[in-house]
Amino acid sequence: MIKLLYPKFWQKQNIIAYLLLPVSLIYQFLGYLRASLAQPIMLPAKVICVGNCSVGGTGKTQIVIYLAKLLKARNVSFVIVTKGYGSKLKNAAIVNARHTVLEVGDEGVILVKYGLVIATKNIKEALPLINELKPDVIIVDDFLQNPHFHKDFTIVSVDSQRLFGNGFLIPAGPLRQYPNKALDAADLVFLVSSTNDKMLNILTPYVNKLINAQIVPLNNIDKTKNYFAFSGIGNPERFFSTLKNYGLNIVGYKIFPDHYNYLQADLENLYSLAKEHNNATLITTRKDYVKFHDLNNNIVCLDVELSINNPNLLNEKIFKKAQIFN
């Protein structure tokens, strides 16, 4: 898998983005061709698909966790299907607590705490396992742009800091598909992190299906210490903002590519950087923390959860449309 940092030209239109537009047109055509030729299959349960229209972290994992807790509280059987990003996964697998990130991906290792999880590169390859588990609901983490299976309910996650970047498709911009298409088709739109008038104006046409959500810390962390933050996720800036908003003294930070698999040498380098910054304590995300399974470390992990301002809208939309819930 190619691992990239979020390039600066994805956020604002400039000469590099314009030079890459012809390649974006090819990407758009291939996506159209793929969708036109696809024959969507029906999965053996109701499908809730959580995705985004842009590259990078938009809070999808936290939304999936929120849904898992919601369904569990209603005694609805479900399975989570995730792509296994950053893993060496070859065949679809039911995730267990002994699996590592290299085997099933960071999302799989995190999500297994909240319910049954299948890690797969191809949704069709997961079918035998889904049939074996017989869930009432399938929560699909990502796969939003995959036209090969029917989706009963779609949730599009939008990060309020980056929004839609420069508005161009990959590789000229961060978009997997144009926002209007994704948002028009969505049953719910999650706006994750802080909001402002500009964002709300852009999303005004979708106000009847808009969920405002915040990423909030779960654990108590010593605020008297200095911290050196590092992260290899899709949107590290949001993580750093969360740390500062929480009142932590961040004296330095280092960004790694998304879904980065750390080596012992990386850990040693991070310890050196922390020492150079007033003997700071290392702090990172849960997605990064789970990758240090085999490495000795003394790292603080910031655990977070999703807090939404209008849960009644979420409940009403999902339970009313799905029609299978108790």
Curated annotation (Swiss-Prot):
The keyword ATP-binding applies. It comes from the Bacteria. GO terms for cellular component: plasma membrane. GO terms for biological process: lipid A biosynthetic process; lipopolysaccharide core region biosynthetic process. Disulfide bonds: none annotated. Its EC number is 2.7.1.130. Keywords: ATP-binding, Kinase, Lipid A biosynthesis, Lipid biosynthesis, Lipid metabolism, Nucleotide-binding, Transferase. It catalyses: a lipid A disaccharide + ATP = a lipid IVA + ADP + H(+). InterPro entries: LpxK, P-loop_NTPase. Pathway: Glycolipid biosynthesis; lipid IV(A) biosynthesis; lipid IV(A) from (3R)-3-hydroxytetradecanoyl-[acyl-carrier-protein] and UDP-N-acetyl-alpha-D-glucosamine: step 6/6. ATP binds at S54, V55, G56, G57, T58, G59, K60, T61. The keyword Acetylation does not apply. GO terms for molecular function: ATP binding; tetraacyldisaccharide 4'-kinase activity. Belongs to the LpxK family. HAMAP family: LpxK (MF_00409). Transfers the gamma-phosphate of ATP to the 4'-position of a tetraacyldisaccharide 1-phosphate intermediate (termed DS-1-P) to form tetraacyldisaccharide 1,4'-bis-phosphate (lipid IVA). This is Tetraacyldisaccharide 4'-kinase. It comes from Rickettsia canadensis (strain McKiel). The gene is lpxK.
